[in-house]
């Protein structure tokens, strides 16, 4: 080492050129490779700290149960009790995730939710609206298409596959997502006793879903399809995913009614006297207990993984009319906007709205059937609309719905 080399040293740590791997010259001094690495690690730590602080700021934006409920009110008519249950359950779930709560004494469980209500009462819409408000990935599956692994049909883990696809395989995002499983009542076991034959689409699916809903590290094929040994898997922690299951549970009301009805019998031939006032479906569903769900065909372990039960009520005529007109994305508003693109005003009379609601009730399709009714009423008009010059207004009245007459056109 020359005397000149001895004079060269790091301006930060003082080490000479021979003591380090590299010495880089600046305008008025030198810096060694070790100090560069130290500065780099300090910058990384600072960057990570800024990211953590930014994450904390975002965590503070978690909407309160009141705010969640208010957002649901903008898009879903009625179902006040179900909205309250959902708002509290969702808030508690994401509060648990965002605070990373840890305690040796208390373990916070997952607030998975079971929605019970008739077809077209808003179960799917509630789940979708929640995910949109919280800005988290959302995936939906139909329980009737699911089977146990190894059988023909969709594996239960395909539900996780859909969630990953919806957030471009970002596992961190997916683990904060919401999965809605519809028609969950259709996977009830076929009988209360143990089955000799394998029930691959009933109790078998319930067993397969148990681990996912409770929380497990699932291995998901990155491009879908069946697993094979050579394929690299994506690991997903399902303990952070909120599962919402929904179903109509036709017949559950009879099970609840049988348990809750008061009856008196005196003598050998006495008749059972029921309450004079017949309870509504929603009133019965509000009284549901785990034993009722077990008798319906859900296994105890599965019921235990869905601690929050939110019953939905049947929609009456007034509720259906409100669904047509009140929400931010109400059907009538959507079609009025569509006609507006053609510079044409679309108007529905109050009698027409009432007739459409009545028709949906007769079909027993709830809110779900309203779109098909409106679509059928306006089909011919929408077909001709671009060709009708100088058309100013289209009026749909009661005769259009009841007598299948064409809407009135004003030029």
From Swiss-Prot:
InterPro entries reported in the protein's UniProt record: AAA+_ATPase (IPR003593), ATP-dep_Clp_protease_ClpX (IPR050052), ATPase_AAA_core (IPR003959), Clp_ATPase_C (IPR019489), Clp_protease_ATP-bd_su_ClpX (IPR004487), ClpX_bact (IPR046425), P-loop_NTPase (IPR027417), Znf_CppX_C4 (IPR010603)
Molecular function as annotated in GO: ATP binding; ATP hydrolysis activity; ATP-dependent protein folding chaperone; protein dimerization activity; unfolded protein binding; zinc ion binding
An annotated GO cellular component: HslUV protease complex
Gene it is expressed from: clpX
PROSITE patterns from the UniProt entry: CLPX_ZB
Subunit and partners: Component of the ClpX-ClpP complex. Forms a hexameric ring that, in the presence of ATP, binds to fourteen ClpP subunits assembled into a disk-like structure with a central cavity, resembling the structure of eukaryotic proteasomes.
Native organism taxonomy: Bacteria, Pseudomonadati, Pseudomonadota, Gammaproteobacteria, Pasteurellales
Cross-referenced PANTHER family: ATP-DEPENDENT CLP PROTEASE ATP-BINDING SUBUNIT CLPX-LIKE, MITOCHONDRIAL, ATP-DEPENDENT CLP PROTEASE ATP-BINDING SUBUNIT CLPX-LIKE, MITOCHONDRIAL-RELATED
Function summary: ATP-dependent specificity component of the Clp protease. It directs the protease to specific substrates. Can perform chaperone functions in the absence of ClpP.
SS bond list: none
SMART domains listed in its UniProt record: AAA, ClpB_D2-small, zf-C4_ClpX
Family that this chain belongs to: Belongs to the ClpX chaperone family.
Entries under Gene3D superfamilies matching the protein: 1.10.8.60, ClpX chaperone, C4-type zinc finger domain, P-loop containing nucleotide triphosphate hydrolases
The keyword Metal-binding appears for this protein: yes
UniProt keyword terms in alphabetical order: ATP-binding, Chaperone, Metal-binding, Nucleotide-binding, Zinc
NCBIfam families membership: clpX, PRK05342.1
Binding positions for Zn(2+) per the UniProt entry: 10, 13, 32, 35
Statement: the UniProt record of this protein carries the keyword Zinc: yes
Start and end residues of each ClpX-type ZB domain: 1-51
Protein name: ATP-dependent Clp protease ATP-binding subunit ClpX
Residues the record lists as binding ATP: 118-125
Lineage top rank: taxon: Bacteria
């Amino acid at each position: 080492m020359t005397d000149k080399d001895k004079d060269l040293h790091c301006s930060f740590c003082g080490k000479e050129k021979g003591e380090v791997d590299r010495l880089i010259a600046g305008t008025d001094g030198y810096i060694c490779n070790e100090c560069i690495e130290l500065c780099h690690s300090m910058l990384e730590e600072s960057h990570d700290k800024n990211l953590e602080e930014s994450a904390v700021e975002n965590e503070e934006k978690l909407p309160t149960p009141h705010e969640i409920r208010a957002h649901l009110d903008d898009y879903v008519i009625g179902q006040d009790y179900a909205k309250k249950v959902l708002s509290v359950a969702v808030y508690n779930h994401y509060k648990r995730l965002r605070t990373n709560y840890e305690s040796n004494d208390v373990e916070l469980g997952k607030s998975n939710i079971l929605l019970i209500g008739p077809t077209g009462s808003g179960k799917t819409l509630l789940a979708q609206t929640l995910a949109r408000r919280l800005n988290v990935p959302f995936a939906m599956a139909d329980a009737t298409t699911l089977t146990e692994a190894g059988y023909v049909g969709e594996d239960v883990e395909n539900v996780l596959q859909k969630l990953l696809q919806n957030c471009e395989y970002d596992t961190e995002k997916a683990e904060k997502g919401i999965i809605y499983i519809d028609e969950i009542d259709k996977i009830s076991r076929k009988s209360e006793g143990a089955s000799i034959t394998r029930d691959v689409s009933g109790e078998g699916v319930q067993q397969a879903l148990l681990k996912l809903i409770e929380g497990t590290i699932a291995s998901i094929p990155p491009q879908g399809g069946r697993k094979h040994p050579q394929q690299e898997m994506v690991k997903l922690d399902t303990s952070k995913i909120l599962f919402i299951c929904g179903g109509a549970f036709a017949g559950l009301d009879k099970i609840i009614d049988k348990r809750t009805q008061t009856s008196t019998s005196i003598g050998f031939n006495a008749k059972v006297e029921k309450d004079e006032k017949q309870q509504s479906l929603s009133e019965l569903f509000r009284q549901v207990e785990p034993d009722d769900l077990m008798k319906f065909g859900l296994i105890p372990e599965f019921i235990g993984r869905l601690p929050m039960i939110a019953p939905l009520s049947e929609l009456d005529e007034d509720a259906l009319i409100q669904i047509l007109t009140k929400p931010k994305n109400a059907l009538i508003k959507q079609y009025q906007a569509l006609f507006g693109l053609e510079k044409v005003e679309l108007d529905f009379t109050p009698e027409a709205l009432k007739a459409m609601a009545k028709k949906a009730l007769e079909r027993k399709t709830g809110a779900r059937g309203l779109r098909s009714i409106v679509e059928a009423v306006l089909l011919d008009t929408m077909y001709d609309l671009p060709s009708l010059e100088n058309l100013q207004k289209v009026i749909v009245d009661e005769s259009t719905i009841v007598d299948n007459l064409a809407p009135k056109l004003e030029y």
